[in-house]
Amino acid sequence: MLVTYNGHVDDNSINNQIIENNVQTDDLNNSFDNHKDQIELKSYKETENIETENIETENKEVETINNEIIKISQEIEISKSQEIDKTNNNINEQNNDNFEIPEKELQEIEACPCNKNIIINDSNNYNVTIIQNDDSIVIENCTDCGDHITPKEEEEKEKEKEKEKEKEKEKEKEKEKDSEESLQEQCLNKENESIDNDNNNNIINNNNNDSIIIIKESTDDKKEIPSIECIQNNQNNQNNNDSPINKEIEDDNNNNIEKDGADIHIKEEQVEKVQVEEKEVEEIQVKDNANSVTSTIVTATDVTTTTTTTTTTTSSSNNCTNSISNTDKSTTTNCPPVENGGDSDGKLMYPLYKKVFGNKTISKLIFKNIRKIQRFKSITIESPSSPLPLSDIHGYGQVKSYSNITFEYMVFNWMIDLLHDKIVKNNEDLNFNNNNNNNNNNNNNNNNNSQPYHYQLKGSQSHEILLKNLKPNDENSKQLLKSFFKKYCDRNSILKKLTEYNNPLLTKLVLKDYLNDFKPVKNNNNNNNNNNNNNNNNNNNNNNNNNNNNNNNNNINNNSYFYKSVPNELLFNLILQQGEIKLVKQVLNGKYKELKLNQMSIHYALKSTLKNEIIQYIINNNRKELSQLYLKSNKCIVGSRRLFLSIFVPPPTTTTTTTNTNSTNTNSTINATSPPHTPKLSSSPLLTTTTTPPASPTQSRIPLVRTLTQLPSRIPLVRTQTQLQTKIQPKSPQPQPTAAPEPQKPPTPSIVKNQMHSQINITPQTKDYIEIGEMIGFEFRIFLELFEVTFPNVPKFRITESCVDSLKELVLKRSIENQNNKSIYSFDVLFDIFRITLHLVLIGCLKLIGDHENNNYNNNNNYNNNINNINYNNNINNNSYNNINNNNYNNNNKTTTTTTTTTTTTTANSNKSKTNKNKNNNNNNNNNNNNNNNNNNNNNNNNNNNNNNNNNEKNIINNDNNINNNEIDISKDKKDLVKFRAIFNQINNLRQTYLFKKKNQEFEIEIKKLFFLDFIPLFGFNEKLLFEKSCLKIDLLHEEKKYGWIIGQEEQPNTLFIKEQLIKSSYEKLDANLFGLSVFLFGIERFSSGSQWFSYPNKIVNNKITNGPYNGNLDKQIQFLEGMIENCKTYKLFDRNETIGIIEAILNSIVITIQNNNDNNNNNNNNNNNNNNNNNNNNNNNNNYNIISIFEKKIQKLLGNCPIKVGAHSLFHSLELIEFCFNNCRDLINFSCCDSMNTLYRDSKFLSIIEFYHRNNLFFGNCSMEIGKSRKRSIAEKIYSFGYRFSNNLIPLAVYNDRESGYLFYYAVEKFIIEKLFNGDGSDYDESNCSSSSSSSESNGIDSGSESGRGRCRSNTTNNSNNINNSSNNNQRFQLHFLLSGNSIPRVIKRNEIFLPTNSKLKWFNLLLSSCGELFTYFPSNEGLCSDFDTPKTNFNLNYEEFYILKFITPFLYKKFKNSFSIKKDFYH
């Protein structure tokens, strides 16, 4: 945590004094001697040095001071609280006794609270568990206690302190007179000044939700000591005089409160200036002076830094509690972890508590518990991704600060903390369960229900009384608490606090009662028993707490003290956090009638850990309105369509057929904690591990080889190792038995046609859906997953075995990884799928069924049985059915089944689910195992059926030639695209019609009609032929048996046939649509950024990269590339860059093929493939694919004919290929273009390739690193380290043109320019001296960081001085290549030039650079070299980045031209 000492004017002088005391008592004494007139803080540098050099001694000293402070504060408190007690007539002695802490115990606690309750954070779930240790147990690494201080030492130090305080008092009285005049001025200036200071120096953005404590150091003592009036005025201005707590305090505590009220805001810091009843307050303040510390907390939540001039109850150490912000009325409870001693247990705040609460016993109680509270807070809230951060949930961006939170909220925070502590402490009192007795405890809880454990209170409604009389089991508390909240608390704040706190116990206490306000009170005790055991709330830290969380749901029923004005989404968020699907369902059911669900509520729900259960609920119960709410809410979110895809799923039970769909759908116990925004890495949310894998019928059936996580940013659709060695032989008979015991056959085409046109109305809803280009480019993964869902009962509807392969690969990818996480899709998703399915189905499945070899399938038969029996049965049945049974989803019976397999499984499983509803998981598993046997038998039946159908398929295959003859006229494209849209609209219309109507079969049939009758003919296919042979008859299970592979083995069937065909047809016909699809088929995905369509990630299997079309068949790859390039001028769906991307993607796959074959590993992966294929591989390996001849003859020719200079991205993963191209087709490859540097950066070959670039004076021209922003700085540092290594050549820099990445750029550049170039002329820099440091910095990720990293290996250091001239010969160039954006023509840069592209933003900079001829050359990207600019014009209008570059990166330029530019007005914004 970063602590900066700066001085807010209204952070009163006490801060400084306390800090001083904490840092070094001796220094404080010295400062008194040296400066008699005023107390002066050490400068920031001094304190920093002291901290860094003397941390250990400092900690000890701080501890001694703290202990002593406690003692003093106790005395003060006793004397003060006696007075206050007189005025507080409402306090019952009885209640006080409950909270009375014996003095001895209190001292022990103060001495070392370590042995009390310790709070442990689970880094995964960010839930907090409290372990109750015996007092005898001492926790290791107690950072809080420091060295315990002997009483003698304490007494001595006390005396010293008191003397010091007397001195201070005298000095301050003198100061008072001098400074009174300036006070008013200070009041006015205070706010501005503090903000300015913050902006200039002290705001540190911290992305981890840490709080940054900024204690401002003020140089002018007069400013340090504003009077109370000044402060109060300020507060009034800031708070608009309407802080209810102030009035309340005055009312409740009469005269004393007036003092206390002032103190509350002042927090006892204006010791010298207390003008309210100066005598008494002053005494106390002088004593307390060293005991309370105030600081300004700047909370850096994620992106935004909220600078609040806040008075906080905070110690001066690395600790923070709640800060009450005067300026924006916001409170932060973010506390960094306690470190290095300090006031971690709140000792310094003790006097403040006493002031606030006016009673020593309550103060002691808070004081006693403060350490646990603080630690709890620091742990809970620190975690950057606590379960449902408000910011993400809202989708509005970051929540900067909570609004309308004032002092009463602080009180509430304390109360919650207190309650939290009491709850933890009095576990047994509160009917919490003990470790292991889940079931028994459930019963007990139900019995005890009559004694709900709330924060029960009696007495007056003042917050003091409320807090003083808190008793967990006091039955009279309801009204008090309710009125308290009504009077003092912003309901939103309470819920936000609870959300932030993420304390399940507290939340449930509050929530349950709150919910009861929404409904007639009923006891629902017995409902949750079964679920409790299953849904352990993700709090796996400690059994006690887990069980408690689960079982507590039953206990709280009748009391409610919140009222109903809380925002629904907040409340719902809290409910979701509890992880109890039952409670959520009750809310969804409308049990709490006034708790209206709005869009954001549903949005939360569908991002929570309960997402899958909620979706199931929505679908099973046909809750159309909820899904609509979600769709609406998603408009707040970027990429809502994709997000929607990742979330919504189709009715499980209705899914027309397979049990599998049902089983997959209805899994209820899914712990998918998915980050609300799926990372770009997997561009489709569906694929990210976060979203629970969509379960599709096949998914369950087909074991998948690759897990999701392995998926690169786009899905190389290609089977990992698939070699598609199958030759395309259109006429070769196809051994795919069209076996389909097919209960429901699609109507014959002719009938369909008539119905089709009569029934379908075209309703344009295109605007909601992505345009055709993106349709084609729509993520293939989603297509695959949804494809299954689209035709749930038609596993037979497959695109070919190749389709099946893809489906398996994609859909199952996930099931392996998340065995239990099956999910389902809604028709909305289906619609998106259709866009692709269409394309795919059409083209792939249909046209191309016939062309492939018999051999492909024969060898794979061995594995099918294993797959079906093991994976299909166990995974699907056990996982999904168990969940179904537990959660009482018994809709399975409704499904109709297509194949015998599915039917039997369905019926068997559904029956089981009825009987086993309430049984434990174990029983369910056994039942399902029995079902597995049934499935095996069924599979055998299917095999027989399939064999019978072989003949039919052969006939169909012969017809393929007809299809091939249907050429597509590219000129028709536009016209066809219009039709295309119309068809999609029809589909959408259908979707609307059937959405949630559980008419899947009808829907499916209609869709098929669309597919085959309207859509496919657009591509010139023979619709009748298609319809008849549309793969509908081929049963998926059968295909799996025939062509499946063993799960977990890398061996897979040959590459997707469909790909081959699509690619083939796309370059035969040069059809843009087909091509677009084929591109996606082999895994290139469109980026959302638009300008960069494709990424080139790798799938690494067995240390081998696989990617691209025709994996392993270089000839076909090149053939396809040929077809692509021949037509590269004519693509209508892709712009120039996209065409480049396509070609590069193909190149990439070629590279990978070459690389894989060179590694000779393909054979191993294809153990079970045909011998023919293996032989092919061997031949290829021997020839090494004749890389040179291939490139010379084909690629060189092709690229030469293409008007586009292909970038080197796709070459990056093969150093051989880079070298080859560099030597042989350098004129065709743009080596300055390295968009995939992101992949490169993570690639093990990063160094070798960069070295190659450096050796050859190549440079990374237009690099855009696709890296998360959080990594940018580390990458900059990494690049910096490479810069050391390669300083004689080139420093690769990857830059975006946005502000944040700009910093990355400036960071790296700053180091180089300032430290290397401008410490000399660049010739005196010798890399040799830095080699060791560079290597160490690499391994540690540049451990030195930005502050210290700068000093390493400067050319002017003594280490380098001996070698200054070693590297100055002409051959070694020190090239610094900067690109902010824009394309540039590569060239070798003369020594010490800085290379910048032409860029509108940077024109001014280019002008400036051009005038420094000796160092810079202006080189616009497309115009050639020209540096003949006139002298710079005056008045360049700079933006922030430009100013930053000019001032900090090129300070010499700044000095030279600083009068020539002005900064834009919004510079600081």
Curated annotation (Swiss-Prot):
Bias type Basic and acidic residues, positions: 146-180
Stretch list, region Disordered: 146-186, 231-255, 306-344, 430-455, 520-560, 654-706, 719-755, 881-958, 1329-1369
Positions with biased composition (Pro residues): 732-749
Name this protein carries in UniProt: Putative uncharacterized protein DDB_G0280555
The species this protein was found in: Dictyostelium discoideum
Bias-annotated ranges (Low complexity): 232-241, 306-327, 430-449, 523-559, 654-693, 1329-1347, 1354-1369
Comp. bias regions, Polar residues: 719-731
Superkingdom of the organism of origin: Eukaryota
